[in-house]
Structure formats: C-alpha cells, structure tokens
Amino acid sequence: MKNLREIVKEKILILDGAMGTEIQKYNLTEEDFRGERFRDLPGMMKGNNDMLNITRPDVISDIYRRYLEAGADIITANTFSCQRISQADYHLENCAREMAFEGARLARIECDKFSTPDKPRFVAGDVGPTNKTCSMSPDVSNPAAREITYDGLFTDVCEQVDGLIEGGADVILIETIFDTLNCKAMIDAALTMMKKHGVELPVMISLTVSDLAGRTLSGQTVDAFLASLSPYPIFSVGMNCAFGAPQMKPFIEHMAQVAPYYISAHPNAGLPNEMGEYDEIAESMAPQIAEFIDEGIVNIIGGCCGTSPEFIAHYARIAEGKKPHQVVEKPKYMWLSGLDLLQVDDSVHLPVDASRFVNVGERCNVAGSRKFLRLINEKNYEEAIGIARKQVADGAAVVDVNMDDGLLDAKAEMVNFLNMIAAEPDIAKVPVMIDSSKWDVIVAGLKCCQGKCIVNSISLKEGEEVFLSHARDVLRYGAAVVVMCFDEVGQATTFERRIEIAERAYHLLVDKLGMNPFDIIFDPNVLAIATGMEEHDNYAVEFIRATEWIHQNLPGAHVSGGVSNLSFSFRGNTYIREAIHCVFLHHAQQVGMDFGIVNAKARMDYNKIPEEQLHLIEDVVLNRRKGAADELIELAAEIKAQADAAKAAAKAGGVAPKKPAAPEWRKESVEERLKYALRKGITDFLQQDIDEALAKYPHAVNVIEGPLMDGMNLVGELFGKGEMFLPQVVKTARTMKSAVSILQPHIEAEKQGGATTAGKILMATVKGDVHDIGKNIVCVVMSCNNYEIIDLGVMVPAEQIVQKAIDEKVDAIGLSGLITPSLEEMVHVAREMQKAGLRIPIMVGGATTSELHVALKIAPEYDGPVIWVKDASLNAGICARFLNEAECPKFEAELKERYEKLRQNYHEEQAKIASLSEARKNKLELF
C-alpha cells in the first residue's frame, strides 16, 4: 500500500472537516463529557472536546466514520488540545497523553476499516496552538514576561506527540498557528518523538492570520513565517481557520509560488455571520474550493470551522482526477526573518545600500559598546532598547546582541533583552544575530525568537564533535549560522589557512548534516592592520582573497566580518576608522562579502573621501606599498589635532553643539503629538507633552478622556483595518500606561476623597471557553486607562460572575468568548444578572460576537445596558461614557434606538428569505 509521500505526488488529497461544530450536533450534556470516570471532577467539562476520546468514543468514531464515507483521505484526530497546558483549564493535565493516544487510536481503527490499496486512509495527529503564546507578554508593564516558555511547551507537546505516534498517527498536523515560536517548539517536539519511536512521519504546518493584511497574531507576515520554517524538514504548509475560501485564496496562491513544500488549505465555511453562525453550505462552497483545485495551487484540501461531511463529499468529487500542485524548488538564496522577511540575494535592497550587502548593527554588544554595557548593568533597558531601535532606523538589517561580560549573567540578560525587543515592532521586524562565546547563552536566545536568527558563532576550535553538536542545535532551533575560520590549531591568519578551514567546515555542514548552504556565513577573521608589525599589514588583503575564494568555491555560502576590528590601531580617531572601513568594504563587497557587523549610522560614502586620503587609505588596506601605514598614522594625528582645535575654539567662543533637528511631528499641536506618540509607541516626549496638556485642560482626567483616548480610538480603527498588528497595539498600550502614570499624581491631587480609579471592571471568559488572549489584551488596555481590573480568567460560570460582581461592587462587566457556544453562554450570564437585580453595564467582545447578536439575543434579557465592543482599544472609551453620570442616560438611549433598528431590519430580511423546503417547492419545473 502506498504511503502519504507517494500518493501526494499523484493526486489531490482530501482532508476532513470541522470536529467542534460536528460534536455540537450531538447535543451532548455535561454528563456526556464527564462520563462515569470524571463525574466528581471540579469545574465544567462541557466544551473540552478532547476528553470525549475517553468518555464518548462512540461519538468521535462516528464523526471519523462519516468523514471517511464522504471520501476523506486524511482523518484529523480529535486531539487539538491534548497538551497539559491546555488541559490544565479542566484539571485534566494528567490525562493529556491518554486523550492524544485514544484520539489517534480511534481514528486508526476507522481508517483501517476504510483503507484499500487504491485508496489508503491516513491519520493526522492534530496538535493545536494552545491558548498561550511564547512570543508575547501577558503583562503590559513587563514586556519580558512570558506565560509559557519554549521548554515548557516543548515538554507538553512531546508528551502529546508520543501518544499520537503510539496511537497510530501517520502524519503530525500542527495547525491554527498564531505564534511561530510556539510552532517551532512543536516541530522540535514532533521530530524529537519521531526519533524516539524510530519513525519519520510527515509534518504538516498550517497557520492562521489575524487579518486580511496577512500577519499572524504575533505579528509575522506569511513570508517571514515561511522563512522561520525554512530550516525544518516540513512536508506541507498551508492555512486554516480565520477565513473563508475567497479571503484565504490570495495567501494560498502566494504560498504556492514561493514555498518549497506541498500546499494545504482548509478554510472555514465562509466567515461567521453576526449571529456567530456559518452561512456557507456545501453546494455554495464547492465552486470556491474548485478554484483552488483547478488553478493547481493545492495538494491537500479540507475544511475548518462550520464544514461537515457534506462539504468534504463535494470537495472529494471536485478533486477526483485533478492534478495536484507542483512544488516549487527551494530558493537559491538566504531567508532570514523577524516580523518581516529579509531575503539575501542579488536583488536585496536595504535602507543604506542598494546592494547585496547586509548591515549587521554592532551597538547592542556589551563587549563592543561601553554605553550599552553601562545601560545593561544599570538595568536601564528602555535606553538600551533605544540603541537597537536607532540602529534599525539607521539602516541595520540585522541586530547583533551580545551579553558576554564577566560581571553579567549573560544567559539571563540575553533572554530578557530578546524578549523585550520582541515587544518593539520597529526592532522586531528585523532578524537577530545571537552572539556569544557561551553555547548555553546562544541556545537560550534561540528559544526566544520566532523569526529565523543568525547564530554567531560556531567553529572547529574544539574539534569536529563539538562543532557538529553545535551545528545540530542550529538546525534544531531553525537558524542560520556564522562559522569562524578557527580550528584545533588556532585562528586562521593567512589566506591558505582561512580557505582550508572554510572548506572543511562547509563539507561537514552540507554533506554530513544536510544544512542548507545558503544558511552558512563564513567569518574569515577581520584582523587589525597598521599595527606596526609587518606581518599584520596583509591581513585585509588575505581576508578579501579568502572572501573571493569562498564565493567562487563554496556554493551558496555567505561571508561576514566584524569590520571595526580592522581599524583597531586607530581607536580614538573616528574619521580615519570610518574611512578605513569604507575602503575595506568597497573592495570586499566586490568579491562576495555580503554581511558586515558595522555601525550602520557611520557608513561613509566611498566616493566622497578626498582623493589623496583615499589613495593613502587604499595603500594601507590593500598593502600596496611600504611606509603607507606610517603615513596614515601621521594623517590620523593631524586630523585628530584639527578636530580637537575646532572643539576648543567652539567652546571658547561659546558656540553650543548643534542640536539635531526636531522630527516633523513635534511641530503639531499637543493633541496631535500625544496621538502620534500613542500610535507609534514613543515615550521620549510624554512628560513634556503632558505638562503642556495639563496647562491647557482644566483637569488631568480631561487629558485622558481627550487626546489620549482619541489616540487609542485611532489605534483601534487602524487595527480593525489591518493597518496595525497586535505587537504594535500592545506597545501603544504600554505607552498609554506610561502617560497615565504621569497623570496619576495630578488626578489624585484633584480628588476630593473619591475613588482612586476610573472604575472597577470585572473581566471573564465565559463558561465553556478557554480562550483568553483577547481578554488579556482588554485587561491590559483598561488598566492602562486607570481602571481597576478583576480578571476571573477562563471557563467562568455565570453564577461566579454574578456573585463576584455583587461582592466587589463592580462598575461594569466584560464578557469574552471566541467560540460559537460562548454566544449562548453570554445570554445565560445576562439572564442571571437580571435575576440577581444587577443593572450595571455589560461589555461583550470576542471573535464570534457581533452587535446584531447583542441586539437580538442578549440585550432583550437584561434591563441594564449591553454593548458590543469591536476591539480592545475601544473598551476604555465606552466605559468612560457608561460611568459618566451625565453621559450614561444619553448613551443608553442611543443603544436602545440602534438595537431596535437592528432587530427590525433583521426580521424584515428574514421574512424575505424562503426556507429550504419552500425554495424546493418553488423551483422551476423544466420537464
């Protein structure tokens, strides 16, 4: 019987459809989910679909069977949340592996019943993304904090995949990925468990993007995501959830053009309507799926939320006999990534150079920058982050980070700094070069980055065994690598030794480990010239010769170097050093040097160096004549003396140093400046601008209610349009919090014994729903706006919400939910609040919620105000209106009028729509 790798080349494979919405059709009770075994377990179990593998295997097997009857080639095991971290919400951590095993085992049994030599059926062990993220902080005041780490997630998924393989999975499907670092940990776990079991299963990867702009929740573009995965042995990539077929298609088309893998797509049954339901039916969805198939952009097609066996039966018929997508070749260039893609090839266009050369920012290095070391020692991370931000603004396409100092905990500082810059989109957009002489520091750094990093560095200094071990880690964590020309004998200083070590290392990496040669960057050692020792004078020439040889003889490999080492003899003379670097790079780039660790801001223009100076510097760099180094030393002394004299004259004349010009946005009104600062996450001028605003507005709170909330509302609009993404919104929230902290003493001083906060808000994800990322963002934004937040977490029963609201005397309640069943639970919460005599405002939010659902289902059950909140940034402004005694009645009246119109329009539209049975009666009879 053919295996999956063989069949995928011959035909389009049919993946099954939704599991969750199919389970809902069985109308299972809490008792069904619990079974006898979990009868006394605390909390609510309904909604934990994975436990049905144990308590109602008949239901799960029946769903598998119906998809197989519909023609599915691949059955996705009901194991989406079989990780300890996911099952912790149900107190079932210790059953996670058992659930995974049973889910795969049940699928194996059904697939074996249907398999034939002509149509074998396969089990995909399903690994969902969890509801936690490795890349983002849950605490706005501490961007370095993480709710889960790479190692913790890796351990959980190892246990899950172990159960899946033992249960009979043929393939591992890692799906609905919203954070690439989560995905990398899951791939690592899958490959580790395969090695344990002695199997090589295909690994399918399916991401989901958060908006039509095409970024994941953690901020990566699709191209950056593909770059992050490029070092791994992936079987297929694709997309699921979030979109219906028409919205997903452009992304799948792009993947098919650039990704060297089989392509999968399993879209939702359209987009949820305002009632949280999916309007597409199998007949209407089929033509949309036919476009994917007929245009040859997929190898695997299936369904996600809202699809059913009926959908899959249609897809199977459409795909019959159609040619699958032809996989494109692996790219012949290097892919690196932060939040965005950096493609290093002959057409790369960078901010400083329109050439192939990649500037690697050198200033975030405690060994090379006294200022950066001081800031890290002082724990002044905000200013240290500013150094990284400035390098990127000045043209660095990669940022080197090094924390190697005898008085620092290098590992802790590396992790902390990388986590912090991950929260800075202006920095995180570029890849990171993790630089350390300590291997544990490098590994710890790799576990913090969702993008494809560069490791700096490995070498043969400790022999081949250590070299290969380190290289395997580079592959394991999905990075590119700098290889130093250093071996057991020592550092290479001649051309011959440089190319000998480079060639040996290249063949070990490419031939023995199978590393992509485009992911290898050689550093042939940039060493100081003009030191007074004749044997050093040819170091630059030898480097340039070695660069040319590597470029010509080691296909795909790149060349880098620490450029500032070259001019070490001239330290203290910035002009000469920059001129030497410029000349050296001019010649090295021409023969293949494509990376350089430099101060991007200090890049000098080769064509603007005075001719006499240029000839002299080239004589030194290229070692063209004896005595040139001594002449350059004399020139350097003259230039330094002139510079010192100019400084002294300026000081004596009272001439102040020229200040840099203020940015254009600083010329706007204080309101516009505050809005801009919020949108861009700039805190540098907050104190100055808030002081100006306080002089203009009668009360400190007016500054929050006015320009600051205007800025937050603008961010909300941009986020809704896909013009801002989540890391930017979180950065805005941090800036808002800083602004509020500046205003807080003024607010307190103006109070007359009143409350110390803007209001007390209770937040909860409703019973049956474990998703809390959106709720957490709301909590962050609200707390930044001076609201006291009581967060009850996830899976919160209505009774607990009501009782806590009464006990804490809260001013408003925020209800969150991601899945469709949460909509009905929100209605239940409103009923319980009505019974308890509460009339405080209810705010409703989450992916499946809508204003229409609030108007039709929730508001009629509750006499207090209920409002749908489109996104996190709007909550604070809405609360401010609700809690303002003068504004609240007017706001409630507006809501009632709007809801009445919505209900009226809805009922009118429904009256126009015939039922399916009526439509069939009214069909046109042609024969």
Q: What residue spans do the PLM features occupy?
A:
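Domain-level signal for soluble alpha/beta catalytic cores
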Residues: M1-F927
